[in-house]
Structures are given as C-alpha cells and as structure tokens.
Amino acid sequence: SVHGPEGDSTMLKMTPDLRFRPVCHQCQSPAMTVHSQGHHRILRDLNLAQSQVWLDVTYRKIWCTDCDGVRVEHLSFADVSKRVTQRMARYIHDLCKTMTVQDVANHVELNPKTVKAIDKSYLEKDYGQTEGKGLRILAIDEIALRKGHRYMTVVMDYFTGRIIWMGPGRSKETLDAF
C-alpha cells in the first residue's frame, strides 16, 4: 500500500505465470519463442473501497509465427493500447451513459481526455458501422457546437430520424467523407 496525492492507493505487482505459454494478442496463437522479458505497464483498475488500485504488470514480447513478427503477449484483463483494465474501461463507459465526461473523470480521478477516449472506443465498437439497407431518402443537417464556433454534419434516415453518420465541420469535404 502506498500513499498517493489524494489518499491511499494500492499497487499490485503481477508477473507472468511461467507454467503457461504466452499467447499472441493479435491472433491468439500460442508462441513458441519469447522475444524479450521484463517489460512493464502500469494499469489503473477499479477502486477497492476508497483506495485506488494500480497494477504493475510485467509482460513478455513474443515472436509470433502466424503474424510473422514480434508481438506483445495477450493479457486477458487489458487491451494492448489502454492504460486501464478492461473492467475499469467498462465501468467508465457505463458511467458515461448517465454522467458527463467531466463528472466521470472527477469521480474516477482520471484525465477527461482519457475518459472520453475510453467512452468513444466503446461507442465505436457498439455503433461503428451503420447499415445502409432500406434507406430511401437521406436528411442532412448541421449542428453547432460551443455557441456556433464548431459544427458537425449529421446524415439521417428521413423517415425514422436514425442517425446514419456524423462528421466534423460543415463543408463539402466533410460530406465527401460520408
């Protein structure tokens, strides 16, 4: 247990279980060769009561024969590019359904940009590609953000009002991206 700037926090050290072969994070195939060991990542996990929980994760880089390259071993509790555990990311996304990004950031004591990026990745996963089947008439509108200084172009199904696509700006180039 360590004392952080805002209160108590707990650092858990995690090391690979050498009884098991590492698995490629990209293709999920078992690795025959460990490329390098002793790499570290610090991940934020869910709080335990009033204590922040941090994981000091030691991981290996492997040579994946299927991907034909060096890859990071798969960690079942964390995504390769994130600095929070999957359950912390899910918690943040669930809070964002009913709270503002700033309120969530204050609650979990993370940077608002981090909270927004986590929520955005879940939204893209859940709602990423919209099907265009059955569309007959499109409606195009623009909405102002921040009192008219920035705009979003919105493309909708005219009959249902379902949002098909959104893009930054209100120019021809924005619509061309659609």
Language model: regions and residue ranges:
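Extended, low-complexity cationic-aromatic segments
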Residues: H74-S81, I163
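Electropositive nucleic-acid engagement tracts
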Residues: A78-I143
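Ser/Thr-centric signal marking residues that sit
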Residues: V72-E73, T85, T114, T153
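Short, conserved DNA-binding cores of transcription-related domains
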Residues: S1-L75
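Mobile genetic element proteins and their domesticated derivatives, centered on retroelements
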Residues: L12-M14, C24-C27, C64, I92, ...
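A generic "binding-loop/recognition-motif" signal
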Residues: F20, N111, F159
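RNase H-like nuclease fold core
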Residues: K116-F178
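Short, surface-exposed linear segments at secondary-structure transitions and domain or protein termini
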Residues: I42-D45, R83-Q86, E173-F178
